[in-house]
Design a protein with these regions (language model features):
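Short, basic and Ser/Thr-rich N-terminal targeting/leader segments
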Residues: 43, 263-264, 319
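Short, charged low-complexity linear segments at domain edges
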Residues: 23-42, 291-311
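Radical SAM enzyme [4Fe-4S]-AdoMet core and its adjacent flexible, acidic
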Residues: 1-11, 69-70, 74-77, 117-120, ...
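Processing junctions and N-termini across compartments
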Residues: 47, 51-54, 255, 317-320
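Extracellular secreted precursors and ectodomains with disulfide-bonded cysteine-rich loops/domains
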Residues: 51, 259, 277, 321-324
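Local cysteine-cluster metal-coordination motifs and their immediate loop/turn environment
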Residues: 54-62, 281, 321-330
Length: 337
């Protein structure tokens, strides 16, 4: 926790700190009064460089081809406009959503622009198609999350279809070696392992692999499922690694759904085409707010459409279909080391 606070502190200005206070104060006040109050602007922003991916993961809307919205890559112009407008109060950028960020040819340049605006940068990748380790280290990414869920190719490929575990290991090993050469502490490399039925037996092996490579952290994560058929196919046998409780052929989140959502007040998403999404669970941008290419971000953040959505969250969040499978407010990560 101390390390995390120290990391955040480096990117704080008086304006950003005041905005952070206003954002969370208005969020908690909204819960108490049950009406949307929005002071300030999002301290955290998720940006989608692309919704295209090189892998075919069976529980991912991009990987399965179930994503309905158009596919494409964010342009540098859209990214620059966004950063120019949000950087005075937004201190953290989460650079992924649906898709592999490094497929965008301008992605490294986007990272450099974000760092020029003194923004904390989080990036998640499947690490199969990376630029050179030198480019990645030079980009000063704060946290590089590597999604790889297996200690053997056979197990890994059951979920990360079309991926090669050996390439992932080789790429991450190269990044860590380049960090040492450059005497850089960044990026902190986090190996993220989604625990599923077919890979829970490899937890000790993956700990050994990540220790040997020298990653900064191994992070275990619970799997998100969508259909009844997924219960027996993907949910691990050990309930410790589940976010759901199962009754017969039905499943539901362990802790229910409360009429609140921190993300809607503090962490929206801008998709590759500039469309503002209320959160990362709105995969197909069903709740229309507006486009950053056509409006100022400040106008979108406090417009009527977003107000009405927040009001519904406070009134009856369970009536919003996408919220029924959202992990907001519950721990999705499992302590590993």
């Amino acid at each position: 926790m101390f390390e995390y606070l120290l990391m955040i502190f480096k990117y704080m200005t008086v304006k950003r700190l005041l905005n952070l206070f206003k954002s969370y104060t208005s969020y908690y006040l909204s819960i108490v009064l049950k009406i949307p109050i929005v002071w300030g602007y999002p301290p955290i922003l998720m940006i989608e460089p692309t919704n295209i991916c090189n892998l075919k993961c069976p529980l991912c809307p991009s990987g399965t081809g179930q994503l309905k919205r158009p596919k494409g890559y964010m342009t540098l112009d859209t990214f620059k406009k966004t950063i120019k407008e949000v950087s005075p109060y937004t201190f953290m950028l989460i650079m992924w959503n649906q898709g592999e960020p490094f497929l965008n040819k301008d992605f490294i340049e986007m990272c450099k622009i974000a760092k020029q605006h003194n923004m904390l940068l989080l990036v998640s990748t499947n690490a199969n198609l990376l630029p050179s380790a030198k480019e990645i280290v030079a980009a000063k990414i704060d946290r590089l999350i590597v999604s790889a869920d297996g200690a053997s190719q056979e197990t890994y490929n059951k979920y990360r279809r079309n991926g090669e575990l050996s390439i992932v290991v080789e790429n991450i090993d190269a990044i860590i070696k380049e960090k040492n050469i450059a005497k850089s502490k960044l990026p902190k490399v986090i190996w993220q392992f989604i625990v599923m039925k077919h890979n829970e037996h490899e937890l000790e092996k993956i700990k050994n692999i990540t220790d040997k490579i020298g990653v900064d952290q191994l992070q275990l994560k619970t799997v998100q499922i969508y259909e009844k058929e997924d219960i027996n196919k993907f949910l691990p046998n050990n309930p410790k690694y589940r976010r759901y409780k199962v009754r017969g052929n039905n499943f539901e989140l362990k802790y229910g759904i409360k009429n609140r959502c921190r993300r809607i007040w503090t962490q929206p998403v801008i998709n590759w085409d500039g469309e503002l999404a209320v959160c990362c669970f709105d995969k197909d941008n069903d709740f229309k707010i507006g486009n950053i290419n056509e409006h100022l971000f400040k106008e979108l953040w406090k417009n009527k459409s977003f107000y009405n959505f927040r009001a519904q969250i406070l009134k009856d969040r369970a009536k919003i279909e996408m919220c029924k499978n959202c992990g907001e407010g519950i721990s999705l990560k499992i302590k590993s080391k």
